[in-house]
Amino acid sequence: MNYYEKAVHTLKEGDYTCVICGDNVDYTSTLRGVQPLLTPYEQGKRFAGCAAADRVVGKAAAFLYVLLGVERVYAGIVSKPAKEVFEKYGVGLSYDLLTELIENRTKTGLCPMESAVIDLDEPTGAPARIKETLARLKSGK
């Protein structure tokens, strides 16, 4: 089983939201949203040559995957803007469902993370936008 197959298998068989596999890497998370990617990014971790599997990938997560150096991603659901990010930066992508945009959890509008980065063309500005949005959501504003 290669890293990609292992990541997809682990995601589908476990209770995980995000799995990254590679040489000496077996990263799993049950956290929702972009936190499973933002935390290792902020800790300076990089996953060059690794494969990832994720339940839902919007543009914010796609930017984080690019910054983390992931080589290939499987997504249960992926947004068109996220797919475009992966294509632009040469990250392999497989998915079950392609959607226009990622909705928020209550299905009343756009996901706040997707909205936070929708106008960005480069991944470098994404972490700051994501952290600002998380702080705003946490404060209830």
Where on the chain are the PLM-derived regions?
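C-terminal binding/interaction regions
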Residues: 68-71, 83-141
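Conserved mixed alpha/beta catalytic, RNA-binding, or beta-rich assembly cores of soluble enzyme
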Residues: 1-76, 98, 103-113
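Short, polar loop motifs at secondary-structure junctions
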Residues: 77-81
